[in-house]
UniProtKB/Swiss-Prot annotation:
GO molecular function: adenyl-nucleotide exchange factor activity; ATP binding; ATP hydrolysis activity; ATP-dependent protein folding chaperone; unfolded protein binding
GO biological processes: endoplasmic reticulum unfolded protein response; post-translational protein targeting to membrane, translocation
Sites where a glycan is attached: N111, N366, N462, N502, N515, N716, N752
Signal peptide positions on this chain: 1-15
S-S pairs: none
Gene name as annotated: LHS1
Family note: Belongs to the heat shock protein 70 family.
EC number: 3.6.1.-
Subcellular location: Endoplasmic reticulum lumen
Protein name, per record: Heat shock protein 70 homolog LHS1
Lineage: Eukaryota, Fungi, Dikarya, Ascomycota, Saccharomycotina
Catalytic activity: ATP + H2O = ADP + phosphate + H(+)
Swiss-Prot/TrEMBL keywords: ATP-binding, Chaperone, Endoplasmic reticulum, Glycoprotein, Hydrolase, Nucleotide-binding, Signal
Length: 889
């Protein structure tokens, strides 16, 4: 799919959008930013989807959190620390027995408990984690990966995820939707999130890939999504208006689901087969002991998941489980026919959701299966041959549309719907109609029955109002119970103890009314938008003529399954932020540790290569380095967990330094090391020393040439030169050079003596290489320092020139002021003027009156008479070097 089909242009904002397909078993994400247009967020292993869940372990007092594919190896070892398939627990309570039983079967070792809000939490190592918090951690890890991806593509660093859209099952009720929104509120994304149904997501993705739609003729399709939790069917229509620039119309007409069909049920069936075969071979093991062993059950379920994938493409799958129970390794083979036999009597339920969608339509079209243009498959388990066979029987093989990427169609569509909702990016226009799956009603305290606000099939988002006649006598409170179908989802409680008296007083002779406005928002969350108190003063007025009295804002909400309060959101969010910070610190330490380990193992390989080339020769340097590497590797094995990032980086630098030294030895093994070769080194070293002395003499001569001029204006050029060197941190180079010359001179004497006595011919290879390397290092260092000193001398001389010219300018200015003074000045002033004139005359008696001639690095004079204007520009230069001396002038 070309991006040009989807995007017209990006609006000039810096908010990135993240679409998430939050599945029960796996997660996929797609990021959209000005520099990353609809790109899948890859896992750390560069895969396009990740495992849904988290593993939390307390290791030596440190909380470690693991995500994604790493959970696969941890769930079989630490099932009690692993929380997977969390989506099924959102918005549920411990009273949902079927949900709890199914979850514990799929997740052996999980310790479920109830929160004070009547929701579910998972206890891990004695700590209670609300499901919303666990989901938030999972989502935050994806958000962090998306932000890292953006950072790699956008170097400005100002673009990051601020908006999120999440694909969810259409049948999610309000408690489940609110729980997911609460989980998002715990992440770093603070903007409102948009929830997109799976079926609509597929419909959007499919619509934008269909250029051949008939004009003004609705085409009907069914999205059949066989995911982990259930088989779901979404009926929708596509219509292309005659004006091709007008938006394509996408209308949702029906939905149904079947919980007895889905990936988890298929996996459970295969797990039962594995369990039966194991018990048949190992008769001493009881089924009870096997079922009650969390690790064994986790291993069986993991093997069943892999077998399901294999059986979708092959007639049989090999199961191999190490140390299943009591160190017993188990290996068996499962045939596809064995798996299908389990569902033989209930195969018809596979397509039950499709029949349900056709039989319970929410629109007026009322189509039949024959009117369907095609069935779009989605979800990983739609690949199961039995599923496709049953669909083909129902609608015909030709109507199964297989040109859709079943794995990514949901994330594509959910991302586009989210972009349309937020408007951050301009996309191809779509006219989308969604309908509610439930009735939404309200019951006010004192009323005998509830009133329907939004009927099943109502288009949303939507608003509606109900006008209630207020009771003659108010009690302490008014309560409005909101219902989704027959389930109470929210109680809005209004304290009327004080306010009702004010209302009655304002409407003494009339009738009070309460106008309650309800909202079914874009996330299909039903709530009261506002309550307005009105007065019909004469009892006969029309509603639009009622007198406004008050708006009720102070509403307390309560329900059986409570959402997170603002205080709980802050508390749980702060905890996640703290863990995230510690994770980042631990990650940085681990990355440094990985670098150190790689360095040490690389050094060990290098040592082996060195020894092979060295043959029978022995080097103390090599022995020392070998001992160093061995010691550090042993230290890491026992103490790596206690090392700080600073300690690790220090050891990395030390390792690299020693490795570099040994590398120079290695590269010198084949070098020429005779008397003539060392004589060449001696000659080169002598030239470097001579060069230093020449530079020193030349620099001193430069200062002597300027000494007289500086003395005339009252400055000591040598003192100023040394002061500038010190303030520019240049003096340390001279000290280093002097020390290196002293060392190099000693080495020259030592080698000359060795050559003269021919003792050099008897030196060991290691000592010869040491001497050669010492020569080379000292010569290279001194040559570098010579170049640095020459350059620094030029800079200092330039600063001295600025200093001199500023001083001369000040003298000229003073002379001009004295000349302009009136003749009535006292004798002392005349004497000062005479001194100034004499001072200036002496300073300018030879050469140019406003500049000092500069000399190049070879000692030749360079004309410095570019004019007073250029000198004044240099004097006014606001560079940091020049400003150092302002206080001295």
């Amino acid at each position: 799919m070309k991006l040009s089909i989807l995007f017209l242009f990006a609006i000039a904002v810096q908010a990135a959008f993240l679409g998430i397909d939050y599945g029960q078993q796996s997660i996929k994400a797609m990021v959209v930013s000005p520099k990353a247009m609809m790109e899948i967020v890859l896992t750390p292993e560069a895969k396009r989807k990740d495992t849904s869940g988290i593993c939390i372990r307390n290791v030596n007092g440190v909380l470690e959190r693991h995500y994604g594919n790493s959970i696969g190896s941890l769930v079989t070892r630490f099932p009690q620390n692993t929380a997977m398939h969390l989506r099924s627990l959102l918005g549920k309570s411990m009273n949902d027995k079927d949900t709890i039983e199914s979850y514990l079967r799929e997740n052996p070792g999980a310790n479920l408990t109830s929160t004070t809000r009547n929701t579910i939490a998972i206890t891990i190592d004695g700590v209670e984690y609300p499901v919303e918090q666990l989901v938030a951690m999972n989502l935050q890890e994806i958000i962090d990966r998306a932000n890292q991806h953006i950072k790699e593509t956008d170097t400005t660093g100002i673009d990051f995820v601020e908006q999120v859209g999440i694909a969810i099952p259409e049948q999610f009720n309000q408690a489940q939707r609110q729980a997911l929104l609460d989980a998002l509120a715990l992440t770093s994304v603070k903007d409102e999130a948009v929830l997109v149904s799976d079926g609509l997501s597929v419909a959007i993705d499919y619509a934008l890939k269909r250029p051949d739609l008939e004009i003004n003729v609705p085409q009907y399709y069914i999205v059949f999504d066989v995911g982990t939790s259930a088989a779901k069917a979404t009926l929708f229509s596509l219509t292309q208006p005659e004006d091709l620039s007008s938006p394509i119309k996408i209308e949702i007409g029906a939905f149904d689901s079947e919980a007895t069909v889905g990936g988890s049920k298929f996996i459970a069936a295969i797990a039962d087969i594995v369990e039966d075969k194991f018990l048949e071979k190992n008769t001493k093991i009881t089924r009870k002991s096997l079922v009650e062993n969390p690790r064994a059950r986790a291993k069986i379920i993991q093997a069943a998941e892999k077998a399901k994938l294999v059986l979708s493409a092959n007639n049989e799958a090999i199961i191999s489980i190490e140390s299943l129970v009591d160190d017993i390794d188990f290996r068996t083979t499962i045939a596809r026919s064995e798996f299908q036999d389990i569902f033989e009597d209930n195969k018809h339920t596979v397509v039950k959701a499709i029949k349900g969608a056709i039989g319970n339509q929410l629109w007026d079209d009322n189509i039949s299966l024959e009117d369907i243009s095609g069935v779009i498959l989605s979800g990983g388990s739609s690949r199961v041959p039995m599923v496709q066979e049953e669909i083909a029987k129902l609608v015909g093989e030709e109507k199964i549309l297989k040109n859709v990427n079943a794995d990514e169609t949901v994330i594509n569509g959910a991302t586009l719907k989210g972009l349309k909702y937020f408007g951050s990016f301009k996309t191809k226009p779509l006219d989308i109609t969604e309908r509610s799956l439930f009735d939404y009603s309200v019951e006010m305290s004192g009323e005998s029955s509830s009133k329907t606000v939004f009927e099943k099939g109502t288009k949303f988002p939507n608003e509606s109002s109900i006008l209630y006649k207020a009771p003659k006598k108010f009690g302490k409170e008014l309560k409005f119970d909101l219902f989704e179908s027959d389930t109470r989802i929210l109680s809005n409680i209004v304290d009327t103890t004080v306010s009702s008296k004010n209302w009655t007083s304002a409407c003494k002779k009339g009738q009070l009314y309460l106008n309650v406005t309800f909202d079914l928002d874009s996330n299909r969350v039903f709530k009261i938008k506002d309550i307005t108190v009105l007065c019909d003063s004469d009892g006969n007025a029309k509603e639009e003529e009622f007198e406004f009295i008050d708006v009720i804002n102070d509403v307390t909400k309560a329900t059986d399954v409570m959402p997170l309060s603002n205080a709980e959101i802050r508390q749980l969010s702060n905890a996640i932020t703290s863990w995230n910070r510690k994770d980042r610190e631990r990650k940085r330490v681990q990355e440094s540790l990985n670098v150190l380990e790689a360095e040490l193992y690389d050094c060990r390989s290098f040592i082996e290569e060195f020894e092979e080339k060295l043959g029978e020769e022995e080097f103390e340097t090599l022995k020392s380095f070998t001992a160093f590497v061995k010691e550090k590797l042993e230290y890491l094995e026992d103490n790596s967990a206690d090392m700080s990032k600073k300690d690790i980086e220090k050891l990395v630098r030390e390792t690299r330094s020693q490795r570099d030294t040994l590398s120079r030895f290695y590269n010198s093994l084949d070098a020429a090391l005779g008397s003539k070769d060392f004589q060449k080194l001696v000659d080169t070293a002598s030239k470097s020393i001579k060069k230093y002395k020449e530079i020193e003499s030349k620099n001193l001569a430069d200062l002597e040439n300027k000494a007289e001029k500086f003395n005339v204006i009252g400055l000591n050029v040598t003192e100023k030169y040394n002061s500038i060197l010190s303030k520019m941190s240049f003096s340390s180079i001279r000290r280093s050079s002097e020390e290196n010359i002293k060392t190099l001179a000693g080495l020259i004497d030592e080698v000359n003596e060795s050559i003269k006595s021919k003792a050099i011919d008897d030196e060991s290879l290691e000592n010869l290489i040491k001497t050669k390397l010492a020569f080379e290092e000292l010569i290279n260092t001194l040559d570098l320092e010579n170049r640095q000193w020459t350059y620094q001398h030029q800079l200092v001389m330039k600063e001295l020139k600025k200093m001199y010219n500023k001083k001369m300018k000040a003298i000229k200015k003073q002379e001009k002021q004295n000349e302009n003074e009136e003749n009535g000045d006292d004798e002392g002033d005349d004497e000062d003027e005479t001194k100034t004139k004499k001072y200036l005359k002496e300073a300018t008696s030879s050469g140019d009156s406003s500049t000092i001639k500069e000399e190049d690095s070879t000692g030749s004079n360079e004309a410095g008479n570019k004019g007073d204007e250029e000198d004044e520009e240099e004097e006014e230069d606001d560079s940091s070097a020049g400003n150092v001396f302002d206080d001295e002038l």
